[in-house]
Amino acid sequence: MHLKHLRTLLSPQDGAAKVTCMAWSQNNAKFAVCTVDRVVLLYDEHGERRDKFSTKPADMKYGRKSYMVKGMAFSPDSTKIAIGQTDNIIYVYKIGEDWGDKKVICNKFIQTSAVTCLQWPAEYIIVFGLAEGKVRLANTKTNKSSTIYGTESYVVSLTTNCSGKGILSGHADGTIVRYFFDDEGSGESQGKLVNHPCPPYALAWATNSIVAAGCDRKIVAYGKEGHMLQTFDYSRDPQEREFTTAVSSPGGQSVVLGSYDRLRVFNWIPRRSIWEEAKPKEITNLYTITALAWKRDGSRLCVGTLCGGVEQFDCCLRRSIYKNKFELTYVGPSQVIVKNLSSGTRVVLKSHYGYEVEEVKILGKERYLVAHTSETLLLGDLNTNRLSEIAWQGSGGNEKYFFENENVCMIFNAGELTLVEYGNNDTLGSVRTEFMNPHLISVRINERCQRGTEDNKKLAYLIDIKTIAIVDLIGGYNIGTVSHESRVDWLELNETGHKLLFRDRKLRLHLYDIESCSKTMILNFCSYMQWVPGSDVLVAQNRNSLCVWYNIEAPERVTMFTIRGDVIGLERGGGKTEVMVMEGVTTVAYTLDEGLIEFGTAIDDGNYIRATAFLETLEMTPETEAMWKTLSKLALEARQLHIAERCFSALGQVAKARFLHETNEIADQVSREYGGEGTDFYQVRARLAMLEKNYKLAEMIFLEQNAVEEAMGMYQELHRWDECIAVAEAKGHPALEKLRRSYYQWLMDTQQEERAGELQESQGDGLAAISLYLKAGLPAKAARLVLTREELLANTELVEHITAALIKGELYERAGDLFEKIHNPQKALECYRKGNAFMKAVELARLAFPVEVVKLEEAWGDHLVQQKQLDAAINHYIEARCSIKAIEAALGARQWKKAIYILDLQDRNTASKYYPLVAQHYASLQEYEIAEELYTKGDRTKDAIDMYTQAGRWEQAHKLAMKCMRPEDVSVLYITQAQEMEKQGKYREAERLYVTVQEPDLAITMYKKHKLYDDMIRLVGKHHPDLLSDTHLHLGKELEAEGRLQEAEYHYLEAQEWKATVNMYRASGLWEEAYRVARTQGGANAHKHVAYLWAKSLGGEAAVRLLNKLGLLEAAVDHAADNCSFEFAFELSRLALKHKTPEVHLKYAMFLEDEGKFEEAEAEFIRAGKPKEAVLMFVHNQDWEAAQRVAEAHDPDSVAEVLVGQARGALEEKDFQKAEGLLLRAQRPGLALNYYKEAGLWSDALRICKDYVPSQLEALQEEYEREATKKGARGVEGFVEQARHWEQAGEYSRAVDCYLKVRDSGNSGLAEKCWMKAAELSIKFLPPQRNMEVVLAVGPQLIGIGKHSAAAELYLNLDLVKEAIDAFIEGEEWNKAKRVAKELDPRYEDYVDQHYKEFLKNQGKVDSLVGVDVIAALDLYVEQGQWDKCIETATKQNYKILHKYVALYATHLIREGSSAQALALYVQHGAPANPQNFNIYKRIFTDMVSSPGTNCAEAYHSWADLRDVLFNLCENLVKSSEANSPAHEEFKTMLLIAHYYATRSAAQSVKQLETVAARLSVSLLRHTQLLPVDKAFYEAGIAAKAVGWDNMAFIFLNRFLDLTDAIEEGTLDGLDHSDFQDTDIPFEVPLPAKQHVPEAEREEVRDWVLTVSMDQRLEQVLPRDERGAYEASLVAASTGVRALPCLITGYPILRNKIEFKRPGKAANKDNWNKFLMAIKTSHSPVCQDVLKFISQWCGGLPSTSFSFQ
């Protein structure tokens, strides 16, 4: 931000006279300054003082100097100023909108202490601080004030955030407090925010932080939640004073702080999120700054000083000029002022989110603003100052903007159309469309206000080329979709968005009504269409007619004018609307009827008075009449009855007008008497209902007001006596009977005997009613009444009287009914027949006269035929067996299917004449197959063939003809027919006939005869494709002969003979055509060749002009030269391309050379300026003398080349001496050198090099050595010879290099000698450094050929101990390596040992490795899977090593699924108490208890092994640090479980211990947290079942089935635990991952449980003992006492306890004695083993081994 001083608004005084406060108005038009004299000065935006007024004290008695103004702020509408004073009051002055308006106080707010600061952030809300520490709010609307929050400290400063919805107050104790009216979703906290080190007199709230400063000369920036962001410390600056005031820019991106003679400016850097100080503005003698005010648009900053001065500064980051028409002033990163340089108008463009404005463009005829930020898009209308900011992600600048609509900007990007309404910060809508053309999109945004509609925003656009979508942009939903049959090329909604006009590519204009979803085509050949602005009138052009729809609701009513031009536009203004028509070169205006236009607008706007006024100016026409009717309807709906009355008067509807006039008088009278709307009066409402013929509504309105008389009067006036009497009956009116009599008398007086009869009938007087009916001439009604009453039927005279009347009146059917009723069937039948009541006659005849039925059916059919009801007659004729009549009726009724059905039932003779008639019908419907079948049935096959022939269906006709005619006859017929067609010029039909009879050649001949070559070619291509090219060529030649060259061209080209075409045009002298064909059809150079020939035919200047025109002059010269036309080439180059002449000479020379004319060629080469080419020519021909002659005369530089060429010849002849001499003459010793090298004459090469090119001698020597190396053995010998030569010459270094170059190429002995010789020479004669290099080079090479000892000795000569050791190691000479390490450098002994170990490991020599590194050996055994050897070897090591590898082997076995082997491992080697092994022990235990087939006597040894291992582990744990740990306790539980399993297996081997085994299975259930719960319950249930404990078996097995279901479902949540309440069987157990019991055994259990549950004999209760608890539960539920488990059964020991030495171990005496007795009787070794284990586990057995007491 840069500050530039503009002007001084108020000059400073000599002494202290501080400006107390300043403020800018919200509209940027006014600036207020309050001076020390308490006077407010008002300035305009340009800095001119325009007004002033004095403030007043709270009480005049204290005088005008009794207070100071501490705060001042403009209202949001800029028409008021609030003044905060130290005499405890705030005044609000209304200053008005114009300068000079009277200043009046409109509000005042008295406070309890001095006002210290003040802000006016929102309408009606003033916020201010008091000296007592409170921050309060004054409401200008209610004239009341209230406290927002209070502190105990003086309020020194007050500021708001950028939006004005939050306030920040600074207090004398340094506290800064924040309060929000609306946090705008930021979620920031309220209340005390921070405690500043000093009173924050300078306080500003920017967008991203809070800036505070004061007397400590430090500026601190705080974050949104009060944490310190930055500190700017000026306390050490002797020039700086305290900071007195601060202000934030309107965008919140900059802050200015005032101190003494200085303004400090800070700018927020968004990318780094820090404040950065700009260069301070220092002004000498400005003194202390007391007030700052920033203009709302950010462009000006005003500064008030201690001496009363006010300075104005211009603020901006940068300025730019846009297209020399607009000035762009960036007053902040997020705020730009756009100024029109011509008009001076300004618009402030600002990002409300604080984003940096990156680029501003002015588009759309320089009216619309477009600007981008990183996250948003800014849009604006410069004319209306409406601005929008919407979220917008950058899309690479690919957006397209359309500004055709003044209310909305259309943005098109990546197939998506976005609409933004100017002035709205949300997108109006977004749709997908690929058609971004303003003519294919129509947006209407509140363009005409309508009655009852506040917001109307609609969009019409194309979804695809034939589908229009209409969207309500407010609701965001689709309100219509128009699918059209052809492409839409223009569309537009009317201004109200109710009608859509669109035109398709066929120039048809359609109108779509959105509410009714109806589409109407209103105009054809429409070239122009437009809605008249401000109305729903439509103007369109149809050819020479101008069409105008004044009332679009009646699209069939159109006004048309004849015009003689094209409509180019519409102009509306000055009270008239004109259609502009371009007639020739003049523009003619056709004026439309403004009244008709205005009428529609007035109607839509609901202004019916205006509409009436319009219509009264018009003459009555059909259009005007329609408008009056529309207005009358709308006026009635809106209850504007006077207007409706006027409408009906205009329409000539006098009755309605009079009725409305009376209604209006009633309404007016009510309005005068009672006030309000008279139309709400009940009589008015009832009369309006009567006007709409809604008499029931009128009745209801009357009766609601209890106006019964009025309701009855209404009906009487309308002569609606029935409704009148009904009202009287409903309300119990006393005049009811009188009404009825009056009604009857009125009926008789008006001769309404029928209605009177109905009245008498309803009252039950049948005779009177009949008499009246007969009098009225209604015998049918009399008959109906008689038929319903038996007593009247008995009156014979009456009945005869009625029947006579009926017959007289020819009401035969009714008479028949009466005769039938009185049982006179004969007369009834006659009457029915006369009255054509055949249905009743047939029904009666079936009962009374069956013989007559057939005749009646035929008569019925005849009657129906007379009535033209032929369809109905068919069935009656069928019933009457009149087939011919039925067929004719069916044919007459066009019931063809019925006719066919009836015909199929007739004999062939009868039917044959009718089939062709039906066939003709089907032929007319083009249902030829059915027609053919019918013709065939009617023996009219020829007609069928004719039918097919006339229909052009020759194939079917041919097929049919072949059936009934001989093939040759068919061919003759068709060919004859085809010839007739040919004569008539119907060639296509003739062709089809020829082709049908397989004679396409006749058709081809026909077309050729008539020169219809296209059709001829078509047929040839179809029937003789192999002859197509020949045909084209033949036709081409024919046409060429006839001079029809264009047609001939076509055929030549189709025959792929473009050259023939070119030749044809050349022969005819049509070079241009020939050139065209060659260019388009030939290859890349064909046209050039033709152009060349064309030019050659012209010759001279004409040829040059032509070739220049075609741009082919150079190409032609080249072509002529290339084709040996040198005369033409020289002619062209001479005339136009002189620079090409040497090139032509050159080509001519080359031509002559090829021809062998060397002397002429030499002359041409020299003319071409290419003597070197002549030299080369002679060299090529080995004419050395001529070559040298030309070179010396014309190209001295080539002399050397001639000599070189001659030398090359000498070399080829092996004349090396001559060649060398020539090369040296040519000063080319290098070439001589190369030739000797190529010839392998290295000695000569070295000689030449030494004499003439000594600088290359060394390189040549190296090359020679490389060459020798390549040659292998021969090369090696050369190296050795060379090395000896160098050695003899004392060149030891070179000799060494030669020796080193010797490679092992099959002769390793020689290589070794050479290398050793090199080493020997280097050690003897070369310096140490070189010596070292040689040895280090020779050593690896000796090792490479297996001479490790020799290499090691070399290394040892130079004390390279490690390299020597490495050589011995690589040679696997370990003893030598160890000896060298031991004797020369003991540090390498470990190095040798390590490599020896690695060697043994790599070689797999584990047995040898054991003696060196046993751990490595063991690891190698593990790697090789030799576990037995590994364990065997480890056994010989210490206990720790052994168990490391035992654990590894056990882990391997467990992974392989061999847990039993792992267990055996620990049985053999013991189970140490290593925590690392715990998981192994647990896994072995888990696998054992989960394994199948272990519930048997045979499994004893497995369980015993597990038991013994766990016992060993527990004994070891007691001695370890893990004693009594949770792991120890868990293993003790596992030991107990293993003991139970082992004891159970032992008991299962002895019959008498079955119950012991069962009890152990039951006892194991209390440990199901460690066991597979389903397996445990299954085993317990089966054991209980085996010993006859059915109750327990049922409960356990039922639980087992529940568990299997739970495993399938994957959850235990559904289990019922009620059976196991008050037991120690756990509920919370792990859910097994799989079933542990096979499917068959599960099904067996399921069947048993189902059987038992069906018997209902068992009680589902577990057995209980003397404790009242479950007998196997250790814990008594009632007492909580826990009993010890018996070592033999696991059951609780309640009495007869035998205790063992180890505490906690006991047995039940009975069980113990039983177990001992079983051992004694069975001598079971496994039981004895159990006893042995118990003795070991429990510290010995009880003293008495057997106890039977």
Swiss-Prot record:
Enumerate the subcellular locations listed in this protein's record, separating them with semicolons. Cell projection, Cilium
Its predominant location is other
Changing residue 1605 to E has the effect of: In RP71; hypomorphic mutation
Q: Give the sites of the cross-link named Glycyl lysine isopeptide (Lys-Gly) (interchain with G-Cter in SUMO1).
A: 4
Gene Ontology annotations of biological process type: bone development; brain development; cilium assembly; cytoplasmic microtubule organization; dorsal/ventral pattern formation; embryonic camera-type eye morphogenesis; epidermis development; heart looping
TPR repeats (start-end): 593-624, 692-725, 809-842, 854-887, 912-945, 947-970, 971-1004, 1042-1075, 1142-1175, 1276-1309, 1345-1378, 1411-1445, 1447-1477, 1574-1607
How this chain assembles, per its entry, is: Interacts with IFT88. Interacts with IFT57. Interacts with RABL2/RABL2A; binds preferentially to GDP-bound RABL2.
Entry's disease? Short-rib thoracic dysplasia 10 with or without polydactyly: A form of short-rib thoracic dysplasia, a group of autosomal recessive ciliopathies that are characterized by a constricted thoracic cage, short ribs, shortened tubular bones, and a 'trident' appearance of the acetabular roof. Polydactyly is variably present. Non-skeletal involvement can include cleft lip/palate as well as anomalies of major organs such as the brain, eye, heart, kidneys, liver, pancreas, intestines, and genitalia. Retinitis pigmentosa 71: A retinal dystrophy belonging to the group of pigmentary retinopathies. Retinitis pigmentosa is characterized by retinal pigment deposits visible on fundus examination and primary loss of rod photoreceptor cells followed by secondary loss of cone photoreceptors. Patients typically have night vision blindness and loss of midperipheral visual field. As their condition progresses, they lose their far peripheral visual field and eventually central vision as well.
Stored PANTHER family? IFT140/172-RELATED, INTRAFLAGELLAR TRANSPORT PROTEIN 172 HOMOLOG
Q: What does this protein do?
A: Required for the maintenance and formation of cilia. Plays an indirect role in hedgehog (Hh) signaling, cilia being required for all activity of the hedgehog pathway.
**What's the protein here called?**
Intraflagellar transport protein 172 homolog
Q: Which organism is it from?
A: Homo sapiens
Gene name, Swiss-Prot/TrEMBL: IFT172
